[in-house]
Amino acid sequence: MTPIEYIDRALALVVDRLARYPGYEVLLSAEKQLQYIRSVLLDRSLDRSALHRLTLGSIAVKEFDETDPELSRALKDAYYVGIRTGRGLKVDLP
């Protein structure tokens, strides 16, 4: 999978969960962060400074690790993509 595919997968899962739980602040925050990462991946000229302030990893662990492991894994992968992109490093997920 490519980095953008990891983001799209996580975004699809978040949108699905938001359909079930509209207005859930944690999911809305995750959606916003995923959309930002996606924008940065598609347009390299965008400001990347906010990539250093992502909270997707902690959201994944604190909110979904036990209750929704699929979403948790997708958010952790997306967080990894965002952090590596912010540091200008290669994203090497399986």
UniProtKB/Swiss-Prot annotation:
GO MF, one annotated term: toxin sequestering activity
Any one GO BP annotation for this protein: protein secretion by the type VI secretion system
Family matches, as InterPro entries: Tsi6
Top-rank lineage group of the source organism: Bacteria
Phenotype on disruption: Deletion mutant cells show Tse6-dependent intoxication with a dramatic increase in division time.
Function: Immunity protein that plays a role in preventing early activation of toxin Tse6.
Protein name: Immune protein Tsi6
